């Protein structure tokens, strides 16, 4: 009977290579467990649970702005530590209002914010604006002035170009329509009084509130703002249409031209 050939003796260099390979795999596994906090979960999962519990038990007063933004980002970016992203967004845009009001392309310039996340943030901003706008429906707008300002600020304060908006009111001063009449450049919006009055007649509006933003952040009215407002008021008056106010929106405040008696 023929004996099988003996197994070759392992080469010392091959044995050393195998030991090194398996040692590296063990080290990598230990590093992964350490990164996951020794529990098989990423270290930020425990932080997320604690943050949610704090909000559930104590409400928003217990959270900083970056905590609130981080809670939102948890859902949008489930497999990543979102605290640095939340802090970077606030550093870039200043406030929660600034983050949600920022244009999509600027949001995407922040590391970790892709197109889908930017769109979701804008969707949240849209929901907030519509909520504020719904507060104006079927109400006398002049008796809900703070709601008007809140809505205009949410809709316009962080636009990067000037935007001229008109709130059309009926004889009860209830909101009929809210329309952006014109969009312009960073410091100018062309507005045509005849077109404003024409649209008011089409909607059977009897009163208007004019609003536009100053992307510079300073809501001080310019000479052109004052002259344009006077022209609209003069064109509307003979047709029984009242211009209640022209509000200029800045990032941190607003100016009522009626309050300053500028027209």
UniProtKB/Swiss-Prot annotation:
<protein>
    <recommendedName>
        <fullName>UPF0758 protein NGR_c13970</fullName>
    </recommendedName>
</protein>
<feature type="binding site">
    <location>
        <position position="225"/>
    </location>
    <ligand>
        <name>Zn(2+)</name>
    </ligand>
</feature>
<keyword id="KW-0479">Metal-binding</keyword>
<dbReference type="InterPro" id="IPR025657">
    <property type="entry name" value="RadC_JAB"/>
</dbReference>
<keyword id="KW-0378">Hydrolase</keyword>
<feature type="domain" description="MPN">
    <location>
        <begin position="141"/>
        <end position="263"/>
    </location>
</feature>
<keyword id="KW-0645">Protease</keyword>
<dbReference type="GO" id="GO:0046872">
    <property type="term" value="F:metal ion binding"/>
</dbReference>
<dbReference type="InterPro" id="IPR001405">
    <property type="entry name" value="UPF0758"/>
</dbReference>
<dbReference type="Pfam" id="PF04002">
    <property type="entry name" value="RadC"/>
</dbReference>
<feature type="binding site">
    <location>
        <position position="214"/>
    </location>
    <ligand>
        <name>Zn(2+)</name>
    </ligand>
</feature>
<feature type="binding site">
    <location>
        <position position="212"/>
    </location>
    <ligand>
        <name>Zn(2+)</name>
    </ligand>
</feature>
<dbReference type="InterPro" id="IPR037518">
    <property type="entry name" value="MPN"/>
</dbReference>
<comment type="similarity">
    <text>Belongs to the UPF0758 family.</text>
</comment>
<dbReference type="InterPro" id="IPR020891">
    <property type="entry name" value="UPF0758_CS"/>
</dbReference>
<feature type="short sequence motif" description="JAMM motif">
    <location>
        <begin position="212"/>
        <end position="225"/>
    </location>
</feature>
<dbReference type="GO" id="GO:0008237">
    <property type="term" value="F:metallopeptidase activity"/>
</dbReference>
<dbReference type="GO" id="GO:0006508">
    <property type="term" value="P:proteolysis"/>
</dbReference>
<dbReference type="InterPro" id="IPR010994">
    <property type="entry name" value="RuvA_2-like"/>
</dbReference>
<keyword id="KW-0482">Metalloprotease</keyword>
<keyword id="KW-0862">Zinc</keyword>
């Amino acid at each position: 009977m023929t004996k099988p050939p003996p197994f070759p003796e392992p080469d010392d260099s091959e044995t050393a290579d195998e030991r090194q390979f398996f040692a590296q795999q063990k080290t990598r596994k230990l590093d992964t467990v350490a990164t996951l906090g020794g529990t098989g979960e990423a270290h930020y999962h425990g932080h997320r649970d604690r943050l949610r519990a704090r909000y559930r038990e104590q409400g928003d007063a217990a959270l900083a702005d970056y905590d609130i933004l981080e809670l939102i980002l948890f859902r949008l970016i489930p497999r990543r530590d979102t605290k640095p992203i939340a802090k970077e967004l606030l550093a870039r845009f200043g406030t929660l209002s600034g983050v949600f009001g920022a244009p999509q392309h600027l949001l995407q310039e922040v590391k970790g914010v892709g197109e889908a996340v930017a769109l979701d943030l804008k969707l949240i901003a849209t929901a907030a604006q519509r909520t504020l706008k719904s507060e104006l429906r079927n109400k006398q707008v002049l008796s809900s002035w703070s709601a008007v300002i809140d809505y205009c600020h949410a809709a316009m304060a962080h636009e990067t170009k000037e935007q001229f908006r008109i709130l059309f009111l009926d004889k009860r001063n209830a909101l009929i329509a809210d329309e952006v009449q014109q969009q312009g450049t960073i410091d100018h919006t062309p507005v045509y009084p005849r077109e404003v009055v024409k649209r008011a007649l089409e909607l059977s509006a009897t009163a208007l509130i004019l609003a536009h933003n100053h992307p510079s952040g300073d809501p001080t009215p310019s000479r052109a703002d004052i002259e344009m407002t006077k022209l609209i008021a003069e064109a509307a008056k003979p047709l029984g249409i009242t211009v209640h106010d022209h509000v200029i929106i800045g990032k941190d405040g607003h100016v009522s031209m009626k309050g300053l008696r500028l027209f």
